[in-house]
Amino acid sequence: MHTQPQSYQAPEQTHMRIENRRIEAGKGGTNLLLIIESRVDTLSINLPTLYSLLFTTNITILMSAPQHRQLRRAAHITKIASIDLCSLEEEDHEDLVLEESGHHPSDIQNEKPNRPPYSTLIRKRSGKVFRFVRPKLADLWHSRYHEASFDLGRRLGIGRRTQSCCEDVCDEEVSVETMAITALPMDVWLKERLKKWVQLSGHEGSIVPATPHTLYKKQCANCGEGRAYKNISKDPALDGFTPKYYDELEKNEEHFIEIEDLLQQFHDPTKTAIMDIKIGTRTFLESEVSNTKKRADLYEKMVAIDNDEPTEEERKCGAITKLRYMQFRERESSTAQLGFRIEAAKRLEGALEKNFKKVRTVEDVTTTFMDFFGTQRSRVRQQLIERLKSMRKAIEHSSFFNSHEVVGSSILIVFDTEKVGCWMIDFAKSSPVPNGRTLNHRTTWIPGNNEDGYLIGIDNLVKILEELPEYGEHPDDQLMVTEEVIARMKNTKS
């Protein structure tokens, strides 16, 4: 039985599809990625001709149908990733069966390199298995075999070598232009990226690198984030203000979406300052607080945070509703007052910081921003103001925001010494407004009106940035320079 893979256009890659029991590739079916895993350390690919080789982020191999037949008969080749199968017109191609196999991205965090990557298996009924990975590169990066050494233009005698490994490949020894690949059982690229990987917020391991330019984000049960991103991608007003959305997948009963890694827009993502700001006066869905049952566990949590908070009636009852607890938590931060709160940040020359629970007032936020922007304050501040004003205008004209409550979303701020970026991220709690009503995102929330205060948060964010002093106007600025120099020296020594 043939399985139709989901139509998917990967970033800067080639689109694959199944059509009439024949595997084809878009864009002429020529430029695909070839990686071989061999049972031996060094594998000489027995291809009669190597037409083209381009080594940038991938390798381009052009092959003809006879070459496919020869390669597929090589018993010592156990896995083929993203090979050009557009010319697979052999008499036995109906014997090919596509099967799904793989593991989920969280395995990468746990360093389980022996698990097979996400892929589609091409399994012959004879039992031989060839692995075909759709060309979105994610599977390759999740494999231990993404690294290979190349010996170009080397003339190799392949007859005797392959004769011992497979049947009916070559009748006599011949010399051909080919390529020797040494499969290195290591994940250098992935380890290097994970070593530099910074996840500001969310559960650890819920977001992992997928490709050099995309991320896998794990989805909770009944999460509509993929649907939200699809709707956003259809809204021209929001173009460029959110990560690009590529795919939604399910593995082992777990759901993931693949989105753009915004940090890859910067020259060196490891040398960027990053801040996650939760936007809105409400960070919970109405459905989450619809239950009016009073709970003792929530009362205990409230008392642990602030023993003076409970009312006399609540103390007698020893229990509170979820709505009461959530509103209390939001008053503890700047969410209720300003319509946003700082979740996490990493300074340009500093470590990740997540302890912003005491940042509540305008003065607290101002001090935090000054520390975060450092000596880049004047430049970053001005560019952020312009970007946020453009974002605000886009939201006001957005069909998506007009018809959706957007709860728990964040503004992601990223900058380095040359560039400043600002985007909206996290749409897991976005949902359509019932009964065709529209939202303005500035009206005060009352149960039932679905208003989220998104624009209240952006309005206040812009206002605070506009009132932020230029660099050099504050007494602490000279101290800031000294701290940055010390931090830079420490990083250089390490």
UniProtKB/Swiss-Prot annotation:
Tell me one GO biological process term.
Answer: phosphatidylinositol phosphate biosynthetic process
- Could you give one GO CC term from the UniProt record? nucleus
Q: Which reaction does it catalyse?
A: 1D-myo-inositol 1,4,5-trisphosphate + ATP = 1D-myo-inositol 1,3,4,5-tetrakisphosphate + ADP + H(+)
State the Pfam families in the record: IPK
Which terms are listed as keywords in the entry? Answer: ATP-binding, Kinase, Nucleotide-binding, Transferase
Q: Where would one find the signal peptide in this protein?
A: none
Q: Which residues bind substrate?
A: 278, 322-329, 429
Q: How is its activity regulated?
A: Unlike mammalian IP3K, may not be regulated by calmodulin.
Sorted alphabetically, which Gene3D superfamilies does this protein's record hold? Answer: Inositol polyphosphate kinase
Stated EC number for the protein is: 2.7.1.127
A GO molecular function term, named singly, is: inositol-1,4,5-trisphosphate 3-kinase activity
Determine if ATP-binding is one of this entry's keywords. yes
Q: Does the keyword ATP-binding apply?
A: yes
- Entry comment describing in which tissues the protein is expressed: Expressed in spermatheca.
What PANTHER family does UniProt report for this protein, alphabetically?
INOSITOL POLYPHOSPHATE KINASE (PTHR12400), KINASE (PTHR12400:SF26)
What family is reported? Belongs to the inositol phosphokinase (IPK) family.
Task: Supply the name of the protein.
Answer: Inositol-trisphosphate 3-kinase homolog
The uppermost taxa in this organism's lineage are:
Eukaryota, Metazoa, Ecdysozoa, Nematoda, Chromadorea
Gene this protein is translated from:
lfe-2
